[in-house]
Amino acid sequence: MASRTDLFQSPDYYMVDELLSEEHQLIRESVRAYVKKEISPIIEDYAQRAEFPQQIVAQLGELGCFGPTVPIEYGGGGLDYISYGLMMQELERGDSGVRSTASVQGSLVMFPIYAYGNEAQRKKYLPKLGSGEWLGCF
């Protein structure tokens, strides 16, 4: 399997960095480092084979990319929408399909269960979706 080096640089042309809290910067840097280490080196090879790298699902769950705005007690990250946007931006930088996986899991699968499901449904589904043990669909 051929790997590639992630040479992406992210100049702050609009001076957004100075507007971010330390927590937001840490979240962004954590996801950016993950993408550089785990996604960028493998994703082109998977794309050429028309395969999805299944091993990243649990990693994305562990990193908190599934349901980051869902409360912690239900298996989410309990974060704000700025954090969510930064996480998705960094995943997108690595691969659009990876970002789609995370955003569908969090926004189109987990959030509706949290917002409209009953307590039993929240407790049954959200922790396993948040960890990546289960992968939802839309």
Residue ranges and their predicted role:
Residues 26, 33, 38-138:
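Glycine-rich flavin
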Residues 1-23:
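Intrinsic disorder at enzyme termini
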